[in-house]
Amino acid sequence: HSKHAAKALWSHVLALQSKMCASTESEDSSHANNSESSSPLLAIVREILNVCTNPAYEFDLANARRRRGETMLSPTTVVLFQELERHNALKAVLRDSLRELLKAINGEIGMSRELDGVAEALSRGRLPAIWKAAAPPTDKDAQSWIAWFKQRETQFESWIEHGEPKVVWLGGLHCPETYIAALVQSACRARNWPLDASAMYTEVTQYRRPEDIDARPDIGCY
């Protein structure tokens, strides 16, 4: 309860700050020659847009398939491509909305209700509703979510380049339950187990860091 109350209080403070800034900007409209870089929202938009367009606009699925070099795709590789498709779609939502918002801030287009929602959410440090709709469920604020976004992209890049990670960050997947189901399916193929009689279980290991693990297990994952 205290955690939610603190989040709500901080959100109200940010909202009040945003309104005060807007009021100040309105009063000082005569000083239109002020630098755009002085706008906190503009800085936020440009920073996130840089994340969304660097190093590339989206993952090239055809190239990823060639790099994997699998004649028959394993269940977990199928999941990887599904994850990449979802990530590309999410990235497109971020990129397109931020570019439109940047144009609106610069006065090139009008501010729609959707763009106004994105601007208000980012000003409060929240995740815009249209981003949430394309992303896995989350309670993260905008800053933490962007860090999560970058980290999951790093995992995908490593997965494409070097194969399935020795340690899989399930929290970085759009549908971790699908990956777990693929692990069960792969184990059943390898051991000739009946799929309908198999299940996943967890076990606590002595490892504390991903760097401590030398290789993936024969079945399952760390």
Regions found by a protein language model. Give the residues of each.
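Long C-terminal appendages of very large multidomain proteins
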Residues: 1-222
